[in-house]
């Protein structure tokens, strides 16, 4: 009598074959892609944000864009700190990194805004769309202009700053939830293609 492996073992072997095929397809498509890019936003730097974005090629007319922005700084009595992640999909009408594109994107932000006597802390979750244009400066450098708008849901807390709480004042915390229509992207960016 011949011993057969259990049925679940056969499924694992098939899953390994499928996984190998999927990895091979991604490897082939990645080697087919001529270049990706790294960029930084000048408007973000002017606002005091440390920022960078990575673009990964998907095909001839599409790229995956992953920008990250961080601002951990305080200026005297004012605080405007945040971490923002905005993954998006860019569809290029001519070819990657050339000409006009549209870009739907998601947004996640964790922020603290403190000024005057109040501090606001919260998260923001949103979705938006932007339009942009990329101009080739040289073989490896591009200049990108992008502007976008979106809807953001933000649950946050509002507190009176502790140094402003007097002897007879009560410390309070308000909890808010809001939907906001906001400009989500305002980019003047230099992009390096590799």
Language-model-detected regions and their locations in the chain:
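Bacterial N-terminal signal peptides
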Residues: 20-27
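Sec/Tat signal peptide C-region and signal peptidase I cleavage site
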Residues: 29-33
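Extracytoplasmic loops and strand-loop junctions of Gram-negative outer membrane beta-barrel proteins
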Residues: 35-37, 113-116, 168-174
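Solvent-exposed loop/turn segments connecting transmembrane beta-strands
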Residues: 37-53, 74-81
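Gram-negative (and chloroplast) outer-membrane scaffold detector with strong preference
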Residues: 56-145, 190-192
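Outer-membrane beta-barrel "beta-signal"
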Residues: 180-194
